[in-house]
Amino acid sequence: FGNERATINFLDCNGTWEYRLPITMNGETIQLGTTGCYATICGEDMYIVSKKMNVSKPDVSDPTFVVCDAKTMKGKAVINSIKTAYGAADGRAFLPMPNLKKGYLSTTNGVYVISLEDYSVLSQIEGTGGYTNNQTGNMIYRDGKVYAVDQTCGLFIIDAVNDKLLKTINNEAEGSTYCSIVEAKDGSIWLT
């Protein structure tokens, strides 16, 4: 991973690239965080997650989470840092759940609940954070539950309505850690 600011690039249906699209908010260009690691579009919004250059300096402008209009690239919200005991949680991925008016932001300190109405940090999912050398990454939503891959703990299964950790499936017996999760067309869930 580099030390450059993250950028957004667009590939149109004709195969033409547009590089370093600016995101503007209140007449100013928003700088994304260092090393973009995830972006997703849901409805009209794009959610962009970036790592931080230095998690021990949470007040330095280095946004973890940026929301913009997916067509116009007009910024809607910026969360610079989610402060923790050691500085800041480093962003990994975002799962919007518009029917619940919230989304989950996975980080190096577990999973945080983000309001989709005002983009504030509502809470942290208890039991998902506080581990050394930890990172929670990709997540999927299905049947009222969120399945979140965690490098240290395995798979978190979270009640998405009540924001409660229901179960952790540990993968130590397999001799490795999970890295990602996907849902196939037939609805089956796969871990790698």
Place the predicted regions along the sequence by residue:
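WD40 beta-propeller blade core
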Residues: 9, 66, 112, 156-157
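An edge-strand/N-cap motif at the start of beta-rich repeat modules
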Residues: 1-16
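Conserved beta-propeller blade signature
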Residues: 1, 45-48, 102-105, 112, ...
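Short glycine/acidic-enriched loop and turn motifs that connect beta-strands
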Residues: 1-5, 52-59, 110-112, 153-154
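A short beta-strand motif characteristic of beta-propeller blades
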Residues: 16-32, 37, 74-86, 120-131, ...
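Mid-chain, structured segments of secreted extracytoplasmic proteins
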Residues: 33-60
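Short loop/turn segments that connect beta-strands within beta-propeller blades
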Residues: 12-15, 69-73, 115-120, 159-164
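Repeated scaffold domains used in trafficking and secretory/extracellular systems
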Residues: 29-41, 83-100, 130-143, 174-187
